[in-house]
């Protein structure tokens, strides 16, 4: 099965942590990593380090091009971005349809707001997002719940609820992406 796995959630919700902890970087297209390809970290007026949002249009154009190439190759791909807007997800779904991919959303929006703010503060300085931005994104996530594909609710504190006796998601690479896909297919696609 050709899978497109779309991670969705506010900054600091654990999307990139999920990818890193499970050694899935080689399957992942990350908007933050693409932003850092376009521009170095910059120092804001407040003296803090930031990843610039100035090139967002270019970032997403490149993301879509890279995604299409991966789909032409038949590669399972994970999209690591907030994915709070229908417009960005619509392009993923358009490509998934063209290349016969099964799109799945792993939704990190169930993370408690206070925990989200704590996790945001514990990130690398350049990845810390202003609280008002997180609040706006949480509102966007709430207003757009269940507006697209098969959604897998994820709270990385509750992996065992979803993965039973497979040693949790931490063992994804050991189990292999095929087992991951099998479990998602069995639990969420074969309803």
Describe the function of each predicted region.
Residues 53-64, 86, 131-138:
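Amphipathic alpha-helical transducer elements in NTP-driven molecular machines
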Residues 2-8, 13-17, 21-27, 98, ...:
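Conserved GTP-binding G-domain of TRAFAC-class P-loop NTPases and closely related GTPase folds
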